[in-house]
Amino acid sequence: MNKTLQFYNYEQCYAHYTKRIMSIRQAKIHDEVIVAKPVLLLALIDGIEGGEFTGNRFVLNEWLEKRYLTLMKQYTRNSQFPNPADISNPFWHLQGDGFWHLIHKTAVAEGSTPTKKWLKENVTYGHFDDDLWVLLQSKVWRQKLRDYIVEHKLTDDGWLGKIAAEGLGAIAAFLLAA
């Protein structure tokens, strides 16, 4: 779908969700940031673009798994880890970032990340906030958001800027303590 609503504030929605995307919590193992959540977002956006997902219901299916693995291989080619994170990790944990939600068939699993098998058996689908879904219906805004994720979450330049900001924050804290 490439519909644009005439009286919808796309700029405001885009600004809100880019801020939320920058706040995505990502694991860091041996100084390497795990990119599974941003990669899952790209796979979902690609599914919308390609017509695989026509409603705000994303089922953990074979197409999504294959697209996710293809993108993981692309964005983790210099990784110290030989195998990319299983799709169950970001599919489950992205719900903690506030704009991705899972609809369960049964009670929610407690404790650690459920397996892919458990997710397929117990989660009906995942979905975005309604406003994000509306934004993603516009081809222009969908591409802008995809480009933003790649630039800020999946490239070295994005991480170098974040590392520099963290370093400046540490220096400022040190100077204030002195």
Residue ranges and their predicted role:
Residues 1-178:
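Intrinsically disordered, charged low-complexity linkers and terminal tails
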